[in-house]
Amino acid sequence: MRYDDFRRSDDIEDRRDDGGGFGGGGGGFGIPMGGGGLGIGTIIVLGLLGYAFGIDPRILIGGAEILTGGGQAPTYQTDRRSGPTKTGAPTDEMGSMIAGILGEIDDRWSEIFQANGQSYTGPKIVLFRNATNGGRCGMAQSAMGPFYCPPDKTIFLDTSFFREVETRFRGCSGDACKFTAAYIIAHEAGHHIQNLLGIIPRVTRLQQQAGSKAEANALQVKVELQADCLSGVWVNREEKKRPGFLEAGDIDAALTTASAIGDDTLQRQATGRVVPDSFTHGSAAQRKQWFMTGYREGTVQACNTFGGGA
């Protein structure tokens, strides 16, 4: 992926130097993704509950558990972080790339919204290491993977997740991993689009009315597959705006990553069996299918997972 000419967004809060937690006495919170502690092995297990990446899992999963008496509603908090925070486009290589990806995502979606007579305000991205305050979505932890917090319109992202995708998920290799990062961020931005369009609130209400956890999970799968499709829409529009930004192997890397974090793949790796009723993000085949649908068609209308047999 060529991104040198991407517009860098300033809607980034860089907490990577915060010390990995809330501060206070002792060493604070530390949840390393590699080595000891919680890593991708934990994510694979948590993936059974939808913790690969997507909407803040405490919102949708918590909602599903409430239906069956298995959990409590998520607690939203005011943001009480400590430690240094930087705002604006980061200058390090990883941070600058993320700022560029967000800038281009915002520009393309702004064009789409304007063409339909609507205004667009982009999401904010919070970069962190290990753990941080997730605002009204509670604690953000590395083991949860990247997620979007609807009430704050914010994407939370520990950039070490991208290394894990390459080294443990084997979702990409070499320069193609840059585009995998773009796919992941575009997926999270897809949830922001759903939020702006009122899809997330409507699905939340439907989940509350669902008669079973399996039914609630099925709704969540449609949300996640639609976000995959919307990420493909962005790639389509970006390619038209900046021909040549994609390089050989980029699309294949995104598809490999989508397959690697499919619910069936994660469940098979974690337990050796697949339970479709417990899916929360969709199968490997579904995730690839809907990303490619968005990429080929380039329209929001093509991403109707709720009526498209997802």
Where are these regions (language model features)?
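Long amphipathic alpha-helical segments used for membrane anchoring, targeting, substrate engagement
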Residues: 1-86
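Active-site recognition of the HExxH zinc-binding catalytic motif
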Residues: 48, 109, 157, 183-196, ...
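Soluble non-cytosolic domains of exported or imported proteins
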Residues: 88-103, 172-184, 214-225, 245-249, ...
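Short helix/loop segments within enzyme catalytic domains
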Residues: 96-120, 217-266
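Secretory-pathway/luminal and periplasmic proteins that interact with or process carbohydrate-rich
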Residues: 132-138, 192, 260-269
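Pan-zinc metallopeptidase signature
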Residues: 259-310
